[in-house]
From Swiss-Prot:
Keywords: 4Fe-4S, Cytoplasm, Iron, Iron-sulfur, Metal-binding, S-adenosyl-L-methionine, Transferase, tRNA processing. It is found in: Cytoplasm. The keyword Iron-sulfur applies. This is tRNA-2-methylthio-N(6)-dimethylallyladenosine synthase. Belongs to the methylthiotransferase family. MiaB subfamily. The gene is miaB. Catalyzes the methylthiolation of N6-(dimethylallyl)adenosine (i(6)A), leading to the formation of 2-methylthio-N6-(dimethylallyl)adenosine (ms(2)i(6)A) at position 37 in tRNAs that read codons beginning with uridine. It catalyses: N(6)-dimethylallyladenosine(37) in tRNA + (sulfur carrier)-SH + AH2 + 2 S-adenosyl-L-methionine = 2-methylsulfanyl-N(6)-dimethylallyladenosine(37) in tRNA + (sulfur carrier)-H + 5'-deoxyadenosine + L-methionine + A + S-adenosyl-L-homocysteine + 2 H(+).
Length: 526
């Protein structure tokens, strides 16, 4: 081929890969990063292939997050030396925290961006290629609400929907508020419009996201009055305390939306109107994830958690009275500074009384910049590890007993992908019950399906089935009998066709077009 003919060929789009660490907020942010890159002309790298651009979306909650990031960056260093045209970007909470330190520890990184300016990523990548220099851009405040950005959703059947970003709490162990900023809430109409967009594309389930979802309404309650007359600030309400319950009820009026979940509420602000909305809104799932952190009132006070064990247990009692089949899960921290054996026993007592279906349990991790990092009474690792094992053993026993109580029940499952590591070996598929429990099930033909359709009606991720639980383990259920029903869905059609929902409008986000392929040279490429 002549050089002139080669130059006439369209440029090949560069490929990208996003690696995500941390919470659901980061998972959803990674969908936005993917959407931004695809809108800019990049395409997702095939599984197992080396991407031209590797983006790390990081977490800063625990020390091992630091170790994981810098370990993975070190693994990419040899490739960067041999392929200088490839690019590495680091974003998220750890980038917001470490800033220029990322380049000091990993000088082969091309772009560092923070939690407030993820929309800048395509421009920063292009600028780094053009200028042959690393770009560090950390904004101190939110530049645009992330949900206005384009998002390439991972799932055809379930979607994350942010209702707020940031947090107004001051938990002494948590670094998130300093990295994500004060709480900013989306307008209910914007939230509901995004949900409707997802449902219109076949999505059956949404999870409402916020650092403290039941504080929803804190940042927009005063706005309407202030628009009319800024002098009314003193008399304007600073909070619509019923806003989150109202939002749940509004979700119940969206046709085609079958499941609504939310994470995470704060016990200090959990009100009965939310319990009533959960119980009275059919598509709100009977599931509640509510962080406890500690069962000791003394430790809760030191954590600045603004509730005590009695209040927490009272919420659980009221939830179970209104929603008897609710599955309740939690977060727990072991080894907070100053924790005594008596404090730890109080945590065991609350866990035993709460009967959580599962718990995310962590050993306390000292995070520089948090008040807890400078507290006296930092515990030896051996003490923390021993207590952690005792807590795990208790919760594993409770989880198994709670799951064993499900044996014989008929459950509706939303068929999922990537949930069962042994599905290929066991010939099972996996799905989530309405209460969030993971169920591995035999995908045989449903009893209600005509024989002529059974070969056609293969069960697909995004479809809905009902089945009977036949076995239990601490972290999952087994259903090895024949399916009772199988409903094909638009979400299943979309998954089978490889289609992913798209949301966001990209307001104010510059498009950079498909980047031209970089020539293979020494040094950084244009």
């Amino acid at each position: 081929m002549t050089q002139q003919a080669a130059n006439a060929l369209p440029p090949v789009a560069r490929t990208y890969q996003v690696r995500t660490y941390g919470c659901q907020m980061n998972v959803h942010d990674s969908e936005r990063l993917a959407g931004l890159l695809e809108d800019a002309g990049y395409r997702r790298a095939a599984d197992g292939a080396d991407a031209d651009v590797v983006v790390f979306n990081t977490c800063a909650v625990r020390e091992n997050a630091d170790n994981k990031l810098y370990g993975n960056l070190s693994h990419l260093a040899p490739r960067k030396r041999s392929e200088p045209q490839m690019q590495i970007a680091v974003g998220g909470c750890l980038a917001q925290k470490d800033r220029d330190a990322v380049l000091r520890r990993a000088p082969w990184v091309d772009v560092v961006f923070g939690t407030h300016n993820i929309g800048s990523l395509p421009t920063l990548l292009e600028r780094a290629r053009h200028n042959r220099a690393a770009q560090v851009e950390i904004a101190e405040a939110l530049q645009e609400f992330p949900s206005t950005l384009p998002a390439a959703r991972e799932s055809a059947y379930a979607g994350w929907v942010s209702i707020s970003v940031g947090c107004n709490n001051t938990c002494t162990f948590c670094i998130v508020p300093s990295l994500r900023g004060k709480e900013v809430d989306r307008r209910p109409g914007d939230v509901l419009a995004e949900i409707q967009t997802l449902v219109d594309q076949g999505v059956l389930e949404v999870t409402l996201l916020g650092q403290n979802v039941n504080a929803y309404g804190v940042s927009f309650a005063a706005d309407e009055r202030l628009r009319e007359d800024p002098r009314m600030w003193q008399s304007a309400p600073h909070r619509n305390r019923g806003a989150f319950a109202e939002l749940l009820r509004a979700c119940g009026r969206i046709d085609g939306l079958e499941r609504v979940r939310f994470t995470s509420p704060h016990p200090a602000e959990f009100t009965d109107d939310v319990i009533e909305a959960m119980a009275e809104t059919p598509n709100v799932c009977p599931a509640l994830h509510m962080p406890l952190q500690s069962g000791s009132d003394r430790i809760l006070r030191a954590m600045r958690r603004s509730y005590r064990a009695e209040k927490y247990l009272g919420i659980i009692d009221r939830v179970r009275a209104a929603i008897p089949d609710a599955a309740i899960t939690t977060d727990l921290i072991v080894g907070f500074p100053g924790e005594t054996e008596e404090d730890f026993q109080a945590t065991l007592d609350v866990v035993a009384a709460s009967r959580f279906s599962s718990a995310f349990t962590f050993q306390y991790s000292k995070r520089p910049g948090t008040p807890a990092a400078d507290m006296p009474g930092q515990l030896p690792k051996a003490v923390v590890s021993e207590r952690y094992q005792r807590l795990i053993e208790l919760q594993e026993r409770i989880s198994l007993e709670e799951n064993q109580a499900q044996v014989g029940r008929t459950l509706e499952l939303l068929v999922a992908t990537g949930e069962g590591r042994k599905d290929a070996a066991t010939a099972r598929l996996s799905g989530r019950a309405r209460d969030g429990r993971l169920v591995h099930f035999a995908p045989g033909a449903a009893a209600d399906e005509p024989l002529a359709r059974r070969a056609f009606d293969q069960v697909r991720p995004g479809d809905v089935v009902t089945t009977t639980v036949t076995g239990a383990a601490p972290h999952h259920l087994i259903a090895d009998g024949a399916l009772l029903t199988h409903r094909r869905t638009r979400a299943g059609d979309a998954h089978a066709a490889g289609l992913r929902p798209r949301t966001g409008v990209g307001l104010g986000i510059p498009g950079v077009g498909a980047p031209a392929p970089a020539p293979v040279t020494t040094g950084c490429a244009l």
